[in-house]
Amino acid sequence: MKEISKKNFDGYKYVDGGVCAAKGFKANGLYCGIKENPTKKPDLCLVESDVMCSAAGVFTQNKVKGAPVTVSQKNLAKTGGKAKGFILNSKNANTCNADGEEKAYKMCEMTAAKMGVKPEEILIAQTGVIGQILPLEPIEAKIDELYEGLSYEGNEKAAIAIMTTDTVKKEVAVEFELDGKICHVGGMGKGSGMIHPNMATTLNVITTDCAVSSEMLKKALTEIVKITYNCLSVDGDQSTNDTCAVMANGLAGNPEITAEGESYEVFKKALYIVMMNITKMLAKDGEGATKLLECTVTGAKDLDTAIIVAKSVICSPLFKCAMFGADANWGRILCAVGYAEADFDINKVDVSLSSKAGEIHVCHNGAGIEFS
């Protein structure tokens, strides 16, 4: 089973619907032919809001960027953070291709024509094999069917269409109250291999019916990515196409969030809940993974130090081997902590290992503790 245990948060309720949980969002996914026959697994999807959205995105910091990353970044810059729709495909990353940007923009044009908006008001993400020429013909042949099939219940089709080596779809949504209005944040993600985001192959689409300005949306997304997707690692390889974008259409009717404050914190927590759960789903479904490993650091001098230490541990191949073999070899944890670029006092380091079976304290103040 690849399901994760979702932690409950006061004031937030998990609901069905993924990217369609928020009011006014439709989605669809279908097979257009990018993936070879005879699989006919969905390989193209579309998410649309009934109205124009505030939008923000964070993208790979790999110097080799996929064409869709460049196009989405340019589109967000041109519009000042606005988007009406998001088109995505799997199987082909459209990366390291001479005509990659031209084709990615063409897909935005095709989508925009159906929605009656400008091409720069469309976001795009692509995932799959790097260096293969992207065939536009299958997409052009199916764009009408894709658009006409948009549905307020189409979230599952969309989530399946972005899968590559994933074995399960990944989506989550929450409902909460904000300034007297019922609001939603929902999302979908994909990724099993080439997972070591630094933004944040992984693609993520987040939708919300909250009214949030583009500036505050980007601020919230950047803050939450730092403690979710950027703390994720499966194989240590940073993708060329990592994309996480959020669209906010304001149809919940709350006063627009334009500055930090209580309303911003309520929204940001909802965003955190959705993104943290998707992060765990991505790790759980990592290629070859048999266990989900989490590292919690307490007592660090600041958040950055805690993140550096935790990521050093979860990225350690020897630590992963120990956990695979259910071997409480805590020395490998201290080894990984030791080579992390963080300041700490070894004489104040404690280590505990926990699982569903229980918890054992294996190291206190930098020294081992007898355990069995």
Feature-to-residue mapping (PLM):
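A structural signal for small-residue-enriched, beta-sheet-centric alpha/beta enzyme cores
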Residues: K2-S372
